């Protein structure tokens, strides 16, 4: 059952790239960017962009950490994206840094892999596009991705004072440098949030109510001016779709405190389609013996 769950999760995380993928022409700009330091291995055309927010304000238990590393940020999961799609990873730390100051841990386009067995024709080598050249760029890409995973390895017991989830979503909707705004030119955008969803900032905190077993409702706060000011700036008809991988075990083990209803209300009012997935099982962290 765990394997079935993992396959489902990977499919859910990166499915739009497969479903909406149409055969793309080869890009000299991307293919000649050997180290990815000129154009991030991106083509002249902006295709799709998947942005992952990893909320590390509450330290992970071992099971959550393994899920992040082995199912979401691993090489094979990212390989599900079509060539030339951009993948970005943001760390929401809450540690002496505001949402505005948050920069990507990783943001590159997925180069062609050189794999004959790939479902994407662009990945498959040819006389004009030899396997060795493709795999060289792809290996450099995976090395950069490994550095991003190492970033989360090094967090240890750190936890943050604030959890500015809404603030960060607002920032990615309006900051051009994150390549996720309506004006970024990407045909499709997907936002993945890996979090316990405990919004906790000066603008809005749901920590106390949710911890007591019943979260405040979205309707009770949404009309406040400072909450309206936090709403995402996405205005186009083709807004990003959202997948929330909800780490419910610590504060909402039975999924009955209204947390998902709160965030469903938020995303609905933002005009964004949201899907939730949850932890498979709430297990205690392993202790050293």
Predicted feature locations:
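Extracytoplasmic/secreted cell-surface and envelope-processing proteins
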Residues: 60-64, 96-101, 199-204, 252-257, ...
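Von Willebrand factor
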Residues: 46-186, 190-192
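A cross-kingdom marker for long, charged
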Residues: 243-244, 249-289
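VWA/integrin I-like adhesion module and closely mimicked acidic/polar interface patches used
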Residues: 198-255
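Hydrophobic beta-strand segments of well-ordered beta-sheets in folded domains
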Residues: 44-52, 83-89, 189-191, 232-250, ...
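Acidic, polar low-complexity linker/tail segments
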Residues: 21-52, 57-65
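Sec-dependent N-terminal signal peptides
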Residues: 4-15
